[in-house]
Amino acid sequence: MNEIVQLFLLIWPPYVANGSAVLAARLRRRHPLDFGKNFLDGRRIFGDGKTFEGVAIGVSAGTLLGYAPNLAYSYLTLLDAFLLATAAIVGDLLGAFVKRRLCMPRGYPAFPLDQLDFLLMALLVYSLYRELHIPLLLAAVVLTPVIHRATNYAAYKLRLKKEPW
């Protein structure tokens, strides 16, 4: 299988998971994952932007839509897509946790946390049970900040995000 196709199939579930979680912002009622609680440092654990609804949307969309191209190419299993999507959401949550500890407000641009946290966690989990080729890893890490910036700008223009980053 072509390495470009493999790269796309590998990064698609985490991209979909990370990108679709923002759709929860459109819901009238959202429930913060941290229940509005603070960490030991007195700051919110994740903040209002990380919700149960966002996790559910992200994992579901990342699994189902992330798996869809594999119906034609058969590279990932449905379980792979689920694990990649779930790990991407966990990576995003870890990034939010770190940003809160660094006193960064919600929506504040923080490279590389915002651009790579979701992908690196997904690839780490994937590498625990399947071989991950270094050229694919490097290509994903190099391309992701550019793709992330472009998709965030599109989400901003569509009024899905408050900031273009």
Curated annotation (Swiss-Prot):
InterPro entries according to UniProt: CarS, CarS_archaea
Any one biological process term the GO annotation gives: glycerophospholipid biosynthetic process
Catalytic activity: 2,3-bis-O-(geranylgeranyl)-sn-glycerol 1-phosphate + CTP + H(+) = CDP-2,3-bis-O-(geranylgeranyl)-sn-glycerol + diphosphate
Pathway membership, UniProt: Membrane lipid metabolism; glycerophospholipid metabolism
Transmembrane feature ranges: 4-24, 78-98, 118-138
Compartmental location: Cell membrane
Topology term for the membrane: Multi-pass membrane protein
Gene Ontology cellular-component terms listed: plasma membrane
Enzymatic class: transferase
Co-factor requirement: Mg(2+)
Metal-binding found in the keyword field: no
Family: Belongs to the CDP-archaeol synthase family.
Function field: Catalyzes the formation of CDP-2,3-bis-(O-geranylgeranyl)-sn-glycerol (CDP-archaeol) from 2,3-bis-(O-geranylgeranyl)-sn-glycerol 1-phosphate (DGGGP) and CTP. This reaction is the third ether-bond-formation step in the biosynthesis of archaeal membrane lipids.
Protein name per Swiss-Prot or TrEMBL: CDP-archaeol synthase
Taxonomic lineage: Archaea, Thermoproteota, Thermoprotei, Thermoproteales, Thermoproteaceae
